[in-house]
Amino acid sequence: MATTKRVLYVGGLAEEVDDKVLHAAFIPFGDITDIQIPLDYETEKHRGFAFVEFELAEDAAAAIDNMNESELFGRTIRVNLAKPMRIKEGSSRPVWSDDDWLKKFSGKTLEENKEEEGSEPPKAETQEGEPAAKKARSNPQVYMDIKIGNKPAGRIQMLLRSDVVPMTAENFRCLCTHEKGFGFKGSSFHRIIPQFMCQGGDFTNHNGTGGKSIYGKKFDDENFILKHTGPGLLSMANSGPNTNGSQFFLTCDKTDWLDGKHVVFGEVTEGLDVLRQIEARGSKDGKPKQKVIIADCGEYV
């Protein structure tokens, strides 16, 4: 059945994880129709795994590519297709009652990550310890003038880390300047999830299915040196490994489960208040409550 391609098993969950956390972690890949977290009725805590059902099979596949063996609350999680069974009373909703299967896969959850996330240096210093002043001189800075509804909301200024990810930074810079004949001007932030991220960059289809890079095709993940350590970080959206185009997102909070899956290539240096205005137009399912447009964009020279 098609449902089996849309439902994911997620194992290795920390005690702190609930349906809201899972929704925030998996919603970037597509619309979610259901989340189930089976409970241990003796302890009244969840059993360390959950099931996430997507509207579309391709979205579920993208979630597996991005989230399997990623980190969530300090633990490495396991994500794969679930094995559903149907409720006998005529319902089409799967029920996760195959305990032998659950024991088999929930037993394979990986150990808690040994490295403390809190030991990371602040993003302004970065992992390489390069002074901020030197980075500001050597790396390009770009801007986006944002319009919410029909009113100007302000400017977001971003530093692009060409010293760490030159290919990714150059792609974004050129899409801001339109020097290749196409780019972000006039496009929208099509997916906005409060306390998570604001995603844009689809200037062809305007719905998250399009966009293109300056290289004429999807390009590879350059590296994962920079991390999703807090709000205001600029990172590439993708549909799996090595599928970078033009879509990007700005973080509204720490999103460390995306580390190693999405390439961070810049940070907001001015206009975090504008990002918060964009964030306020979001919703749990990612659909903006109000149109958010990149009215103009370019490079500081």
Curated annotation (Swiss-Prot):
This protein's record includes keyword Ribonucleoprotein: no
InterPro entries: Cyclophilin-like_dom_sf, Cyclophilin-type_PPIase_CS, Cyclophilin-type_PPIase_dom, Nucleotide-bd_a/b_plait_sf, PPIE, PPIE_RRM, RBD_domain_sf, RRM_dom
Keywords annotated in UniProt: Isomerase, mRNA processing, mRNA splicing, Nucleus, Phosphoprotein, RNA-binding, Rotamase, Spliceosome
Gene Ontology cellular-component terms listed: mitochondrion; nucleus; U2-type catalytic step 2 spliceosome
Keyword Zinc: no
Subunit structure and binding partners: Identified in the spliceosome C complex. Component of the XAB2 complex, a multimeric protein complex composed of XAB2, PRPF19, AQR, ZNF830, ISY1, and PPIE. Identified in a pentameric intron-binding (IB) complex composed of AQR, XAB2, ISY1, ZNF830 and PPIE that is incorporated into the spliceosome as a preassembled complex. The IB complex does not contain PRPF19. Interacts (via RNA-binding domain) with KMT2A (via the third PHD-type zinc-finger).
Primary role: Involved in pre-mRNA splicing as component of the spliceosome. Combines RNA-binding and PPIase activities. Binds mRNA and has a preference for single-stranded RNA molecules with poly-A and poly-U stretches, suggesting it binds to the poly(A)-region in the 3'-UTR of mRNA molecules. Catalyzes the cis-trans isomerization of proline imidic peptide bonds in proteins. Inhibits KMT2A activity; this requires proline isomerase activity.
The protein, known as: Peptidyl-prolyl cis-trans isomerase E
Gene name tied to this protein: PPIE
